[in-house]
Amino acid sequence: MLDPSIDSLMNKLDSKYTLVTVSARRAREMQIHQDQQIENTKSYKFVGKALEEIDAGLLTFEKEDQE
C-alpha cells in the first residue's frame, strides 16, 4: 500500500492533475535547492517526499483568477 494514500492526498488538493503538477514542481525544487520541509521521510525519492509534504499540509496550491 502506498503511503500517503491517494485518498488522503485528494482531500488536500482539488484534482489528480493538480496533485501531479504540484508534486512534480516541488520535487524539482528539492533536487535543485536540496531543501526539505520534513526531516524524516519514508520515501527516498523526491516525488515521494513532495507527496509527504502535501499530506502533512506543508505544501498547498492556490488557483489564480484568470480574466
From Swiss-Prot:
It catalyses: RNA(n) + a ribonucleoside 5'-triphosphate = RNA(n+1) + diphosphate. One of its GO terms (biological process) is DNA-templated transcription. GO terms for molecular function: DNA binding; DNA-directed RNA polymerase activity. The keyword Transferase applies. Gene3D superfamilies: 3.90.940.10. The keyword Transferase applies. It comes from the Bacteria. It is an enzyme of class 2 (transferase). Keywords: DNA-directed RNA polymerase, Nucleotidyltransferase, Transcription, Transferase. Its EC number is 2.7.7.6. InterPro entries: DNA-dir_RNA_pol_omega, Pol_omega/Rpo6/RPB6, RPB6/omega-like_sf. GO terms for cellular component: DNA-directed RNA polymerase complex. Belongs to the RNA polymerase subunit omega family. The RNAP catalytic core consists of 2 alpha, 1 beta, 1 beta' and 1 omega subunit. When a sigma factor is associated with the core the holoenzyme is formed, which can initiate transcription. Promotes RNA polymerase assembly. Latches the N- and C-terminal regions of the beta' subunit thereby facilitating its interaction with the beta and alpha subunits. This is DNA-directed RNA polymerase subunit omega. It comes from Bacillus pumilus (strain SAFR-032).
